[in-house]
From Swiss-Prot:
This is Phenylalanine--tRNA ligase beta subunit. Its cofactor is Mg(2+). The keyword tRNA-binding applies. It is an enzyme of class 6 (ligase). The keyword tRNA-binding applies. Pfam families: B3_4, B5, FDX-ACB, tRNA_bind, tRNA_synthFbeta. PANTHER family: PHENYLALANINE--TRNA LIGASE BETA SUBUNIT, PHENYLALANYL-TRNA SYNTHETASE BETA CHAIN AND LEUCINE-RICH REPEAT-CONTAINING PROTEIN 47. It is found in: Cytoplasm. GO terms for cellular component: phenylalanine-tRNA ligase complex. The gene is pheT. Residues 698-791 form the FDX-ACB domain. It catalyses: tRNA(Phe) + L-phenylalanine + ATP = L-phenylalanyl-tRNA(Phe) + AMP + diphosphate + H(+).
Length: 792
């Protein structure tokens, strides 16, 4: 938001200097980005009129001008501006004037004397326009100091507004904050009512419900099309970053900047019937003021005339109904459109307008009737005309209502940590335009209709802190004894998990906790999803159900950039919808890893090979060993896993995760052209561990017996090893699978599993009879329980 310092001071009388004003604005949250002083060195610049302009005898692009500067005699000025002409009124810098770093002196240009310089707005530091001389109105008083005529010195102040402060997109809105911060009061503003002189009206119909609940319109006939924008109004616009265009357009811009209410002016003679406000229809077209033809859909609000669209509500008017230099009859529009109805619509069409910027953040719903009276008064004062009555159409049930909030003095002290005097609380809130009534425990406060951001008690406390001054809130360090939690011996902490995985040459990655719904569909993870109410984007609209979709996508991006060996892991939370509709989503901590490419870094001592299931399983078993977890693996039917190369992971009979190769079809859909091996587990079941217990070391030798069985394909090693452990009992130190074979010599439907049994007793040396008895029992159990037979 850019505005004139003098304009602001006309609404709030303060004694603060310009620097103090800028500091105050920043301190109360209206961050000042730039202050541009205007007209501070124009002491010898006056209003002058060119009486005669002839071509320079030695230069085609120069003119020799005779200029009346109000000194009794004409001054000869050589000028190269393309718009220099007889009768033009423009600023003249007299000899001795200092313009920026340039001091004006009498000089000769191509042999012709020049006693001063006719100036452009840019040369005077008033605007960026350097296309020609700064043209002043024909009735500007010749000889008057330019600074006095233009109301200088002044400054153009630009502030940066946060999205919640839509009320400060106007000079008057800023004035309320300044008044509160400087213990002043905003100058009373009464728009008054302009009495109608004619009965001419246009009917207005509201057919957009809550999106357009208020619309004011007024006909003004017989205005003077030759009327020009007065210099005071044009300068206020220019110093606010708006270039003057024509009187009617400038008046609507002026009202928007002063009050915050965007307006539009239609040429009445181009309108054919009653005004309507409705949602556009698919395929409707409209030529906008900038000459572009746009095709609309049902998401846009349109202003219609006898059914045809004539303007995009809240964004831009139409070309066919615009006001021109010949307009004599005008229809003024002042309306309230809901922010949700305007938000994002301009971006769909590539439009960015001041009106749209304000409407999508929220305009005071009570302002349209006042704004149309102010605009009417300006039109009548500057261009004449006959006003008709204001047509006021509204849907009261859809108009936002000001919030009524109970503010407790005890709550102020609790939130801010300081006591603010009751009188100061009332003064600050009333200066901000709020209605305040005292009650037993504090105050009953009603926020003004322009303050959409005031809804709860904490909003009022924030306003008090902002105006009172954050720098006046003393710094108080929190007290109390700090208690450092002792690490638990019964579980492995996350840092240890990270270190274990890093030691296995895995690199940690941190992905968004939000994923694309389409990505989860590819993984066939569609149940229990938790959608976000306000996603960052459409691609990040679902809370992740697993770590693997995001982790594998990251791995794919790395693999696509010539990374030959990618080894990633992630620790993070996953989310699932609760079974009860009203309950909060559940969340749990998971750990996942994904690898692809070479199994080992390039070296001369080992032949190159690709990473496989058993490599990553070894990494997982090393992690499990750190917590003492005994993991079991069962064939998995997860749809995202390779059907023959994936397994569900169990601990103590409970499934806690998955490991395997990502299904080739899924990898192809993700544009990954290498095999991806991955695992994901619930973290807490993995890291739980029993307190270490010292066991007796046997002084007696161990005995090893190797057995090979033919077992059906569907029988897993986990089931076989479990039977062995149950059968042998405490004599079994370890059972190792050292060979798995399928092929010649093994009948179809079976596989050969070769295992080693390591037996040991703590009290004696095992005899051959002891060992043979154990082996006999193992063979019998495996043959009986798993339909296996000993391989000869």
């Amino acid at each position: 938001m850019k505005f004139s310092e003098n304009w602001l001071r006309s609404h709030v009388p303060i004694q603060a200097t310009r620097d103090e004003l800028a500091a105050t604005l920043t301190a109360i949250g209206l961050e000042v980005e730039e202050v541009t002083p205007l007209g501070e060195s124009l002491g010898q610049v006056v209003v002058a009129r060119i009486v005669e302009a002839v071509r320079h005898p030695e230069a085609d692009r120069l003119q020799v001008c005779s200029v009346d500067a109000g000194q009794g005699e004409l001054l000869q000025i050589v000028c190269g501006a393309p718009n220099a002409r007889a009768g033009l009124v423009a600023p003249l810098a007299l000899v001795g004037a200092k313009i920026g770093e340039l001091t004006i002196t009498a000089a000769k240009l191509r042999g012709v004397a020049s006693n001063g310089m006719l100036c452009s707005a840019k040369e005077l530091g008033l605007d960026s326009d350097a296309s020609g001389l700064f043209e002043l109105p024909d009735d500007a008083p010749v000889g008057q100091a330019l600074a006095e005529y233009l109301g200088l010195p002044d400054a153009s102040i630009e502030i940066k507004l946060t999205p919640n402060r839509a009320d400060c997109f106007s000079v008057r809105g800023i004035a309320f904050d300044v008044a509160a911060a400087c213990a002043s009061e905003v100058v009373a503003f009464d728009a008054g009512m302009v009495a109608p002189v004619s009965t001419r009206t246009l009917a207005v119909e509201l057919d957009a419900g809550k999106d357009a609940p208020r619309y004011c319109g007024r006909v003004i006939e017989g205005i003077d099309p030759s009327a020009k924008t007065p210099v005071w109004l044009a300068e206020r616009l220019r110093r606010s970053g708006v270039r003057p265009v024509s009187l009617l357009v400038d008046i609507t811009q002026y009202v928007m900047l002063e009050l915050g209410q965007p307006m539009h002016a239609f040429d009445l003679d181009t309108l054919q019937g009653p005004i309507g406000v409705r949602h556009s229809r698919v395929g409707e077209q409209l030529v906008l003021l900038d000459g572009r033809q746009v095709t609309l859909d049902e998401s846009f609000l349109t202003i219609t005339d006898a059914g045809r669209p004539v303007a995009l509500a809240g964004l831009m008017g139409g070309l066919d109904t615009r006001v021109t230099d010949t307009t004599r009859n005008v229809f003024l529009e002042s309306a309230y459109f809901a922010p949700e109805a305007i938000m994002g619509r301009g971006r769909k069409l590539g439009l960015h307008t001041d009106a749209g910027h304000r409407f999508e953040r929220g305009v005071d719903p009570a302002l349209p009737p006042q704004a149309i009276e102010v605009a009417t008064r300006l039109v009548l004062e500057l261009a004449g005309g006959t006003p008709g009555p204001v047509v006021h159409a509204q849907l009261p049930e859809h108009l936002p209502q000001p919030a009524r909030i109970r503010l407790r003095r005890a709550r102020i002290a609790r939130v801010l940590g300081i006591q603010i005097d009751d009188a100061d609380v009332v003064r600050m809130l009333r200066a901000l335009g709020m209605h305040v009534e005292a009650v037993a425990e504090g105050w009953e406060v009603m926020a003004p209709s322009r303050r959409f951001d005031i809804a709860i008690e904490e909003d009022l406390i924030e306003e008090l802190a902002r105006i009172h001054g954050y720098d006046r809130v003393p710094t108080t360090l929190p007290g109390g004894a700090s208690r450092i939690a002792m690490p638990s011996e019964t579980q492995l902490d996350e840092l240890s998990v990270r270190r274990q995985l890093v030691a296995r040459e895995l690199q940690e990655t941190i992905n968004y906790a939000f994923v694309d719904a389409a990505l989860l569909e590819r993984w066939q993870l569609t149940e229990g999803l938790v959608p976000l109410a306000n996603p960052l984007s459409a691609e990040l609209a679902i809370m992740r159900l697993r770590l693997l979709p995001g982790l594998v996508a990251t791995l794919g991006r790395n693999a696509a950039r010539q990374a030959g060996r990618v080894r990633l892991f992630e620790l993070g939370k996953v989310f699932a919808a609760a079974a009860d509709a009203g309950a909060a989503p559940g969340e749990s901590q998971h750990v996942a890893a994904a690898v692809c490419g070479d199994a080992l870094a390039l070296q001369w001592g080992e032949p190159a090979r690709k990473v496989d299931f058993h490599d990553l399983k070894g990494d997982l078993m090393a992690l499990a060993a750190a917590s003492g977890a005994q993991l079991e693996f069962q064939p998995s039917t997860q749809p995202f896993g390779h059907p023959g190369r994936s397994a569900d992971i169990y601990r103590n009979g409970v499934c806690i995760g998955w490991i395997g190769q990502v299904h080739p079809r899924l990898a192809k859909a993700l544009d990954i052209d290498v095999d991806v091996i991955a695992f994901e587990l619930q973290l807490m079941p993995l890291v739980q561990r029993a307190l270490p217990r010292a066991g007796e070391l046997s002084r007696f030798p161990s005995v090893r017996r190797d057995l090979a069985f033919l077992v059906p394909d569907e029988v897993s090693w986990a089931a076989v090893s479990a039977s062995v452990r149950t059968t042998v009992g405490p004599l079994l130190r370890e059972v190792q699978l050292f060979d798995r074979y399928v092929g010649q010599g093994v009948e179809p439907g079976f596989k050969s599993l070769a295992m080693g049994l390591i037996l040991q007793d703590n009290s004696r040396t095992l005899t051959d009879r002891d060992v043979d008895a154990v082996v006999t029992d193992v063979v019998a159990v495996i043959e009986r329980e798993h339909r296996a037979r000993i391989r000869s």
